[in-house]
């Protein structure tokens, strides 16, 4: 159960980061202020919810185990940037993602 909460906290944190990125995207038409407020508002909601879930995680897991699990954020952000904004991801970056996933699996088996 706490693993699910940890993944949700990670996804919400990443959602907040992605909303911040979207807030910086140029618009082809007017409404810049509305666009900015919408995405930054969503970012605050996501990050606030992530913080609440993170506090639940910290009540259960030692911080030395829980915190490295947030490395999942790097994986989610890489995948989202690649899919949503078609950002180029170099092979060495994918290797880094694979190493992060390996580390999470190793740490997760110790929890």
Swiss-Prot record:
Residue span(s) of domain EamA: 40-109
Presence of keyword Cell membrane: yes
GO biological process: lipid A biosynthetic process; lipopolysaccharide biosynthetic process
Keyword Lipid biosynthesis: yes
Membrane topology term: Multi-pass membrane protein
Single GO MF descriptor: carbohydrate derivative transmembrane transporter activity
An annotated GO cellular component: plasma membrane
InterPro entries associated with the record: EamA_dom (IPR000620), Flippase_ArnE (IPR022883), Small_drug/metabolite_transptr (IPR000390)
Membrane-crossing segments per the record: 38-58, 61-81, 89-109
Pfam families: EamA
SUPFAM superfamilies the record matches: Multidrug resistance efflux transporter EmrE
Known pathway: Bacterial outer membrane biogenesis; lipopolysaccharide biosynthesis
Protein role: Translocates 4-amino-4-deoxy-L-arabinose-phosphoundecaprenol (alpha-L-Ara4N-phosphoundecaprenol) from the cytoplasmic to the periplasmic side of the inner membrane.
Subunit architecture: Heterodimer of ArnE and ArnF.
Name of the protein in question: Probable 4-amino-4-deoxy-L-arabinose-phosphoundecaprenol flippase subunit ArnE
Gene from which this protein is expressed: arnE
């Amino acid at each position: 159960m706490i693993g699910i909460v940890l993944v949700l906290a990670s996804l919400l944190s990443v959602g907040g980061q992605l909303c911040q990125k979207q807030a910086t995207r140029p618009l082809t038409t007017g409404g810049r202020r509305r666009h900015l407020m919408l995405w930054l508002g969503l970012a605050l909601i996501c990050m606030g919810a992530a913080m609440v879930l993170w506090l639940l995680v910290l009540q259960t897991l030692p911080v030395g185990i829980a915190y490295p699990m947030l490395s999942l954020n790097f994986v989610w952000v890489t995948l989202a940037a690649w899919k949503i904004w078609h950002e180029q991801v170099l092979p060495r970056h994918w290797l880094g993602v694979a190493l992060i996933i390996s580390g999470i699996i190793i740490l997760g088996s110790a929890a």
